[in-house]
Each structure stands twice: as C-alpha cells, then as structure tokens.
Amino acid sequence: MSAYRRKRRGGNIRKALWILLILLTLGALQQTLWPNARLSWTAQAEKEAIGIIVPPPGDYAEEVLTAVGSYYGSPDISMNMGQPLFTEEDRQLGEQHETEGYESYADLDALGRCGPAFAVLTKATMPTEKRESIGDVRPSGWHTVRYDDLIEDKYLYNRCHLIAYMLSGENANPQNLITGTRYLNISGMLPYEKRVADYIENGGGAVLYRATPVFLGDDLLARGVELEAEALRDPEFSFHVFLYNVQPGVRIDYASGQSKREA
C-alpha cells in the first residue's frame, strides 16, 4: 500500500511540474508574441501630416485568434498580461494633444471593413450634444435579424463604435462603426468604455486608446475587437483585452454575417 502511494505521489509531482512548465511557456509566449506581431500603426511623427494609419498585416488576425482561443463563456480575455502596446511615438502624440485630444481612423479597405482607430481621449473629445441617428450606416457584414427569445433587445447586431461616442463624440462615421453583436457591444465594450469615461471625467487626464477590429481573411464580420488603453500620466490605469464578437445561443457565419439559432 505504501509503495503504491509513493508511486502515485511521484506521478503527481511529475504531473505538477509538467503543468508548471506549460504555464510558464504560455506566459512567456503571451509576453513576447504581441510586440513582434504588431505593426506600429500610429508612428505619427511621420504619418500625422497625411493622416495615414497602416492596417495590420494579413496574418495578424490569425496570430491573435490563435492566442486568445475560442469564446469560452466570458466576453473578454486579457492580452499581453493586460499591458497595452503603445509606442513612444504614440505617447509623444499624446503629449502633443494632451489638452484638446486627437482621433485618427483608418480608411475602409476594399471590402468596406474598418481598420484600427486610435485616439488621445480628453474631456475635450467627449460629446456636448445629443447623439443623432446612425441608422444610415451599413458596416460590413450587416444584417437586420432578431432573436426575440434570446436577446433582451431583440436584435442580434448593433452598429458598434470602435471608439465610443461617449469618449469621442464621433457618431455616424463609417470608419468608426463595425457590425457587432449586442453581446459584444453591451457585455464586452461598454464596461471598458465606461471605465475610461469615468477616469477622464474624474480628473484623471488624457488616455491613449486604440480599438482594432480583427477580421480573419476576407470575412465581412470581425471575430472580435482588440482594445487597449493607457493613461498618459498614470501607467497604473491601463488595459489590453480581446472582446469576442459572439452571441450566446446564436451561430454566426463570419464570412457573410449570416446567422442561425444554435441547435
């Protein structure tokens, strides 16, 4: 009996060591993957004059989706240990526009899809007027479809702002609107948007902010949004997350935006 217990204990130790090794490897991978994968989309010292944001490379979406994995029951997952990947150029741009703020939106691509949106958010960028209708904007992958018994607000899709209206005052801008599920919009993006808005309104100062829709291949619907924020003068206020563009109970075809009820 005692020999069996010693053997079992040794097996458990070996198993624990293997698990620890795997976790350390995954942690190192997550820590190093993103800086190597990301382009410096906002090296504005060179680009600001002509207003260019370079879209991410084609394989970037595959790297992101491989790292974050499939939806697992939570609307968000941390990326790069929660640390955003803003460059020194981004921070210099923040310092230049620390009071009045700054916003830059990528041009739509050949499929009509949004690219990254970057901003230096301040009280000056927040809206002072009532929000108007955005119903005339039809972002890529848009369909008007309802699941009344699955979704409290009935409709599967919202026109989701990459940079929220409450933060930017930017409303019916096609370069700032993607097709997102109600779940992405309300459970995923809204809590982070409110967190940033509260920080600024309570005197926290300027915040660097980037929202990157992640499209796989020629998909018209983004698989999710990579969201980063960092206070210009307070590095303790920051986050870096991936938000899943899913809707529990609904199966989505990301190539077209079509959907059906899960069996």
Residue spans for each PLM region:
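N-terminal Lys/Arg-rich, disordered targeting/topogenic segments
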Residues: 1-13
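Polar/charged alpha-helical tracts
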Residues: 14-15, 62, 66, 222
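Hydrophobic membrane-insertion alpha-helices, especially the h-region
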Residues: 16-31
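Residues in intrinsically disordered, low-complexity segments of regulatory proteins
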Residues: 17, 33, 40, 101-104, ...
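Hydrophobic single-pass membrane-insertion segments
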Residues: 30-42, 230
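N-terminal, intrinsically disordered, polar/charged segments of Gram-positive cell-envelope systems
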Residues: 37-94
